[in-house]
From Swiss-Prot:
It comes from Pisum sativum (Garden pea). It is a single-pass membrane protein. This is Chlorophyll a-b binding protein 3, chloroplastic. InterPro entries: Chloro_AB-bd_pln, Chloroa_b-bind. The lineage of its organism: Eukaryota, Viridiplantae, Streptophyta, Embryophyta, Tracheophyta. Belongs to the light-harvesting chlorophyll a/b-binding (LHC) protein family. Chlorophyll a 1 binds at residues 78, 84, 102, 232. The gene is lhca3.
Length: 275
């Protein structure tokens, strides 16, 4: 976690001095054989060694590099608001919870990004009936935007959904607060599969990693990085779905088809009336 950067005062002093020299555009010692510019740039920045981890830096600052040591998947020192700073005014939420929440929300976003566009796409290719091939905002999740005819009324479905999700989220929080505790509580004889790995974000086991991915540390590290990157992209995609729905009134797949058919008249600028 981010607080690992504070374990060794000597390594922190060295890291802070390296960052200070880079901001002053000073050359590193000749033994290193390279020099750095005064600004820490975005993804184009060459990998640097900070806290023992080689990584590119994205608009990192001296302060953010004091607690973001590269130990987290997808950590490039980017924290302009100081949300992960354990001692700063921005750190009003525990950094460990923020890192955990990003992974969980990224997984939900990846499922949502696919689930929101799937019915629309399947309807276009004729795999499901047109009456169910609806844009995501017309399925009843936003009542004014669409109607539906399910087995129960919307209030019953809402209460049922909240009860089921609330139970699952409560169990997940229990495991975060006390890792491994779910494997000690009886749960229909399945509790052994919920024992976890000691890391609540990556519980593993037959239910959460049935294919046994990440059997060694190197492959597990690569998979964690890929998951975080795709999760961040999916969260942006969900935001894009919302904006598209509000602006154009059609689903994301139809927006894509319209853009491909006529990119000059169907794009971000024309949709937002910047023309």
């Amino acid at each position: 976690m981010a607080t690992q950067a504070l374990v060794s005062s000597s390594s922190l002093t060295f890291a802070a001095e390296a960052v200070r020299q880079s901001f002053r555009a000073r050359s590193l010692p000749s033994s290193v054989g390279c020099s750095r510019k005064g600004l820490v740039r975005a993804a184009a920045t060459p990998p640097v060694k900070q806290g023992g981890v080689d990584r590119p830096l994205w608009f990192a600052s001296k302060q953010s590099l004091s607690y973001l040591d590269g130990s987290l998947p997808g950590d490039y020192g980017f924290d302009p608001l100081g949300l992960s700073d354990p001692e700063g005014t921005g750190g009003f939420i525990e950094p460990r919870w923020l890192a955990y929440g990003e992974v969980i929300n990224g997984r939900f976003a990846m499922l949502g990004a696919v689930g929101a566009i799937a019915p629309e796409y399947l309807g276009k290719v004729g795999l499901i009936p047109q009456e169910t091939a609806l844009a995501w905002f017309q399925t009843g999740v936003i009542p004014p935007a669409g109607t539906y005819n399910y087995w129960a009324d919307n209030y019953t479905l809402f209460v049922l959904e909240m009860a089921l999700m609330g139970f699952a989220e409560h169990r997940r929080f229990q495991d975060w607060a006390k890792p491994g505790s779910m494997g000690k509580q009886y749960f229909l004889g399945l509790e052994k599969g919920f024992g976890g790995s000691g890391n609540p974000a990556y519980p593993g086991g037959p239910f959460f990693n049935p294919l046994g991915f990440g059997k060694d540390e190197k492959s597990l590290k690569e998979l964690k990085l890929k998951e975080v990157k795709n999760g961040r992209l999916a969260m942006l995609a969900i935001l894009g779905y919302f904006i598209q729905g509000l602006v154009t009134g059609v689903g994301p797949y139809q927006n894509l088809l319209d853009h491909v058919a006529d990119p000059v008249n169907n794009n971000v600028l024309t949709s937002l009336k910047f023309h």
